[in-house]
C-alpha cells in the first residue's frame, strides 16, 4: 500500500515536471552539477516578496490581468534577494511573450524583461531553506573562483518543482550573472 502511494507521488511529480515549459539556454561549460549557461532575454512577471507573493503571481497568470488572459505556468519560479528587497518572478511562456503580454491589473505585479546574459549555475536538491540557499551559493562562488569567473549582481534562486515534490527529487538552482567583461553570450 505504501509502495503504491509512493509510486503515485513519484509518477505525479515526474509527469507534472515534464509538462511545464522552461527557459531556453545554451550550455557553454559543464562540470558535474555546475554549468555556465547563456540565456536569451526573457519576459518575467515579478512581485515583491512577502505575504502572498506566490498568490499574486498566480492570480496574474490565472486571468487576473487587464486582458483576463490565462497564462500557462512555467518553471522555474525565480527568487532574487537584493539587500532589504526580495522579489519572486515567473517566466512568461515564449508564445505569450512573442505576442502581447497582458498588463497586470495593479501595481503589485510588474512585467519586466531580463536581458540576455551568461550565468554560472549550481544545481542542487532539497527544501527551500536559508541554510540550503547559503550552502549552494557558497559552493557556486567557490567553483567560480576555480574557473576565474567573476560574478556581478545578486544571486537568483530557481525552484522547478511544486511543494509536494519529495525534497531529494527537487531541482533547485542558484545562478550568478557572470561579470560583463566575461560575457560571451552565444547567438
Predicted features and spans:
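A solvent-exposed interaction/effector surface
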Residues: 2-187
